[in-house]
């Protein structure tokens, strides 16, 4: 079935992109990205016992894009991906039964999606090469109605770093490359009013992991209303997501030159009501003829550990948190977080971005520094490091494993990514 779905996607492509001779030509594009990284783990880290420290990894990401517009209002989109990983982290992740691509290149499994459009080309202990279809959709865009069916993406919410309202393949807050979200098989609609407000609806069917059958308990149906009044924009959301009922709202407005954003999400599951909240302020200014923007964001995760006990034994009892982490919806273990960041224009071609992610409950933090340099047109270099801060027993210092004196601790990492866009 897996290979049949993949081949079906390939064979459907010519039909979707083939149009009458009078139509415009296909718009092609894409990128090739190569990343080299090295991660150093402490001696008491569980990763040190199953992998070389420092761990050296290489990743390859090739994406070919095709988009077709014909007449008005039809369009079609296709993205092909070739993904490769080679290195010590893959060996360690397999030894610890952790998905390597969840750690390095984002979610790639199509196990629960309606169509399995991912196929492994080759695989060994320290390497894997696979290809997949990440976008394959047909769209209609009228004056007041928009519809799209197929593999596509949706991004919602006002969170700039933490995104509780964006539960369709959100980015890890500490991800260094946020160019492309992973696509989902969905049906999307949007109704636009004369005043500029809109109502969006998304249906994402998913399969049961065990049986492979499409199930309503694994699927999502979401509606979001967006409107603007004076200088304030607001959102209202209602969803059935897996077996949860979700209600939410968000605001965004200008205040004395800064932009204030916030989202509040309530999840009703197993007779429990759980809240999530994010609020941020961002401000831009010029200093010494350099453009600078700053960001401060608070995040509350009601699914996180309330008592600050992040041991493996304690986490296994928090099934709601672990389920959302395994689905790629949550990336934190605690409840209260503060992120502070800035974007500094060193030169028009060089951007420096320092960010500090802090767990307010245990005081641990993750420091990230990114340097983005445009070498020339279509060529880009992204380099930097991440440094966990905190004592053992904390989220970023290292959570206790089941082995006494051994911790699941993140390592300090150096990385460089070279990108070519075409």
Residue ranges of model-derived segments:
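Transmembrane beta-strands of outer-membrane beta-barrel pores
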Residues: 34-40, 82-86, 142-144, 151-155, ...
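Residues that define the transmembrane beta-barrel architecture of outer-membrane proteins
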Residues: 54-60, 129-134, 141, 181-185, ...
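Residues on the lipid-exposed face of transmembrane beta-strands in outer-membrane beta-barrel proteins
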Residues: 62-68, 135-141, 187-191, 223-227, ...
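Outer membrane beta-barrel
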Residues: 67, 74-198, 204, 390
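Detector for outer-membrane/organellar transmembrane beta-barrel domains
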Residues: 258-261, 265-357
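Outer-membrane beta-barrel "beta-signal"
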Residues: 380, 385-387, 405-422
């Amino acid at each position: 079935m897996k290979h049949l779905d993949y081949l079906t996607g390939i064979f459907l492509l010519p039909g979707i992109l083939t149009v009458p001779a009078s139509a415009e030509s296909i718009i092609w594009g894409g990128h090739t990205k190569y990343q080299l990284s090295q991660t150093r783990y402490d001696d008491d880290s569980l990763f040190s016992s199953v992998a070389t420290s420092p761990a050296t990894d290489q990743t390859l990401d090739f994406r070919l894009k095709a988009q077709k517009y014909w007449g008005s209002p039809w369009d079609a989109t296709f993205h092909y991906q070739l993904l490769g990983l080679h290195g010590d982290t893959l060996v360690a992740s397999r030894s610890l039964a952790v998905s390597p691509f969840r750690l390095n290149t984002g979610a790639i499994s199509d196990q629960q999606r309606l169509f399995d459009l991912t196929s492994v080309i080759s695989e060994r202990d320290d390497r894997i090469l696979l290809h997949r279809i990440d976008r394959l959709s047909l769209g209609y865009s009228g004056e007041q109605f928009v519809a799209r069916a197929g593999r596509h993406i949706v991004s919602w919410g006002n969170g700039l770093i933490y995104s509780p309202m964006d539960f369709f393949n959100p980015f890890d807050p500490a991800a260094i490359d946020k160019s492309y979200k992973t696509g989902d098989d969905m049906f999307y609609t949007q109704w636009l009013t004369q005043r500029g407000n809109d109502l969006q609806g998304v249906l994402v069917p998913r399969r049961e992991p065990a049986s492979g059958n499409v199930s309503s308990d694994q699927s999502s149906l979401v509606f979001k209303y967006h409107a603007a009044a004076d200088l304030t924009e607001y959102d209202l959301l209602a969803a059935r997501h897996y077996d949860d009922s979700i209600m939410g709202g968000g605001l965004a407005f200008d205040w004395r030159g800064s932009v204030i954003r916030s989202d509040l999400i309530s999840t009703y599951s197993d007779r429990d009501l759980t809240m999530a909240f994010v609020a941020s302020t961002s401000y831009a200014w010029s200093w010494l003829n350099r453009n600078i923007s700053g960001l401060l964001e608070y995040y509350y995760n009601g699914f996180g550990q309330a008592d600050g006990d992040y041991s493996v034994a304690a986490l296994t009892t928090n099934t709601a948190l672990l389920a959302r982490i395994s689905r790629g919806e949550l990336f934190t273990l605690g409840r209260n977080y503060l992120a502070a960041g800035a974007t500094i224009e060193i030169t028009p071609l060089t951007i420096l971005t320092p960010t500090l992610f802090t767990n307010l409950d245990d005081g641990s933090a993750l420091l990230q520094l990114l340097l983005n340099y445009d070498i020339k047109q279509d060529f880009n270099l992204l380099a930097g490091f991440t440094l966990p801060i905190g004592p053992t027993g904390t989220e970023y210092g290292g959570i206790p494993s089941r082995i006494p004196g051994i911790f699941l601790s993140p390592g300090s990492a150096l990385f460089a990514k070279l990108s070519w866009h075409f």
